Each structure stands twice: as C-alpha cells, then as structure tokens.
C-alpha cells in the first residue's frame, strides 16, 4: 500500500470542533473552562509528541513490554512481542496507537483489552464513508434549544452543556480515565482524517458559542485500519504504528483454547489452527481471521463435533462469508488433520 503523498483538504476557518452552530444563534455563553483530570493509573495522550510533564507509569503491571504481554495474556489476549512493545510505547510516550492489519486479527479486541487493563470500557467511534466531525465530536440538540427559547427571556444563552450532545471524542475527553477507539479509520475520507489530525495535535477542543476545553489528561487513543485504502502518512506519524499479523499456528491454537474452554482438552483447537493456516494460503475472497477460528470452534463444540472434518459441513456458515469461498474451504476442512 504505497503511493504518492497527497495533501489534506483545507478546512474552513475555525478551531477543532467548529462547524455550523445551527439556526439558533445566541451569544454570551459561559467563560472558557479547563478540564483537569486528577491523577489516575491511566497513561495516554493524543499529543503529537511526548509531553514534557509525562509521569512514570504508576502501575507496575505496565512497566515493561513483557509485563504488558503478561497482563493481556491474563485477559486471554496473546500479544506477540512486537505488539506488546507497541502498546507499551504508546502508553509510555503518551501517543496514539495505530493498529493496521487484515480483518479479524484482533485489532478491535486489543483496544477492549487495553480498556480492561485500565479499568474502563473503551468509547468507540466507528468510522464509515461520509462520517463528519459532528458525528465524532458533538452536536447541539436544536429541538430542546428551540423549546427552551420559547419559554425563556430574550438574551439567555441556549449554548449550554445541557443542550450539548457529546459524541465519542468529547465523551472520551470528559470521562476520567478513558480509552478512545477510532475503529476502521480507512473507511473515512481525507477530510475526516484531516479533522482527526487536528484533534491529535491539539491540547484544546473549541466549541463555538460555548467554551474552549483544555485537555490536560487526554484519553488513550487506539486507531484501527483494515488497510482497504492508504491512510495519510501525516496521521500515522502522530502515532505508534504496528502491523498486526495473523498469529502463529501454535498461538492460534492457544487462543482458541482460552476462548473456547469446551475444546481445551481435545485436539480440535490444534486442528482448527492448522486448517486456518492452510486457508490463508489460498486465494480466498475473505480469508478467515482469528475471530472466525474462535467462532468455528464454538460452533463445533455446540454441534458436538470432535474433529474439523466432522464439523466441515454443518459449521461452514460461521467460517465462510463468501459463496465463492465455500467449496475451497470445505475441501480443506474435510481433509482434516494431517
């Protein structure tokens, strides 16, 4: 996925979070405020570079990449050494973590596990074609504003927190601590990438007619991409980048055992891992990921099948999502263990 660099589109004048305030415009909101987050075990930043005032990580569990890997393993997520190091560096250097890889390799799951490590549920921003800043940052509740205007004296501000609908980025800034998952950024367009770049570089969020929020302790940000298109290099440069590959056959078998205890004492997990390795070597429309391996193991266990060959026909639907792939996948599964 290489190609010539492309410039970001220019934004209209205004700060991050700007945008049309809508038809109801009343000046005179409260003064700017600062959100100052108290000390907590959360480490992370959306800054473009490590902040000078960064504190050492207070939780000994996160003190080395090896300890990160151990903590993730405790949560049934097996992280390769390079991936554990990327998580550690993103925390230590207070930078966003950019995870890229094929669908189903565990990128989104890792963000959830990081949230578990930090004791929070990740706030997810699901990207899609046409997503804009209002869906990511905030919107005004125009209906409530209009109703309020009808029953209040002239001149009273309708740009107050009670009328502000916080979207994922603003919610992540306001919650303490927080993990912000920006999922499948490759599905968004250049303009939204440019908006995110402004957010990742800034220490404030400006909400016109309301106030400017100073971000003293930003959320830990995880961005994921399936590689369907090239994400702009300027955005990646603000992050710790890691390509998440498929696990080794041995690791995949262990992942299956950890997530599907019903097959832990049988040869089925190893057989499935071997079959998945073979399938990924074929020219399939949609090669199976780890998520499909786990789903197939659960289906086989539910059906009472003890080998891959026995489950080949009945459990095929949880593994294959493209009609063109069915015959090739069925042949590999029916062949069973070597």
Locate the predicted segments by residue.
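C-terminal regulatory/interaction module of P-loop NTP-utilizing enzymes
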Residues: 40, 50-338
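Compositionally biased, low-complexity flexible segments
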Residues: 1-33, 49
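Hydrophobic alpha-helical context, especially transmembrane and signal-peptide helices
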Residues: 5-10, 20, 35, 67, ...
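Short, positively charged and aromatic/hydrophobic N-terminal segments
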Residues: 24, 35-36, 43-56
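Intrinsic-disorder-associated, low-complexity terminal segments enriched in Asp/Asn/His/Tyr and depleted
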Residues: 11, 39-40
């Amino acid at each position: 996925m290489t190609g010539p660099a492309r410039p970001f589109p220019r934004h209209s004048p205004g700060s991050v979070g700007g945008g049309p305030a809508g038809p109801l415009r009343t000046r005179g909101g409260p003064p700017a405020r600062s959100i100052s987050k108290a000390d907590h075990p959360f480490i992370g930043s959306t800054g473009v570079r490590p902040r000078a005032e960064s504190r050492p990580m207070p939780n000994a569990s996160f003190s080395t990449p090896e300890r990160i890997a151990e903590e993730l393993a405790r949560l049934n997520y097996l992280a390769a050494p390079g991936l554990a190091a990327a998580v550690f560096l993103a925390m230590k250097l207070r930078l966003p973590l950019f995870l890229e890889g094929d669908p189903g390799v565990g990128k989104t799951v890792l963000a959830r596990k990081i949230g578990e490590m930090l004791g929070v549920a990740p706030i997810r921003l699901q990207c899609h074609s046409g997503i804009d800043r209002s869906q990511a940052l905030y919107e005004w509740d125009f209906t409530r504003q209009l109703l309020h205007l009808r029953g209040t004296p002239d001149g009273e501000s309708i740009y107050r927190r009670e009328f502000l609908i916080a979207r994922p980025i603003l919610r992540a800034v306001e919650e303490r601590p927080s993990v912000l998952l920006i999922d499948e950024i490759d599905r968004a367009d250049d303009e939204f990438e440019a908006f995110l770049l402004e957010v990742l570089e800034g220490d404030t969020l400006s909400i016109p007619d309301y106030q400017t929020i100073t971000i003293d302790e930003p959320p830990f940000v995880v961005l994921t991409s399936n590689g369907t298109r090239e994400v702009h290099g300027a955005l990646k440069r603000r992050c710790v980048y890691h390509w998440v590959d498929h696990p080794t056959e041995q690791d995949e078998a262990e992942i299956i055992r950890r997530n599907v205890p019903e097959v832990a004492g049988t040869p089925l997990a190893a057989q499935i891992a071997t079959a998945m390795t073979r399938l990924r070597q074929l020219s399939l429309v949609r090669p199976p990921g780890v998520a499909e391996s786990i789903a197939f193991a659960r289906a086989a266990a539910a059906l009472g099948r003890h080998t891959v060959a026995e489950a080949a026909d009945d459990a095929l639907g949880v593994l294959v999502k493209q009609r063109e792939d069915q015959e090739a996948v069925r042949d590999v599964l029916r062949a069973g263990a070597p």
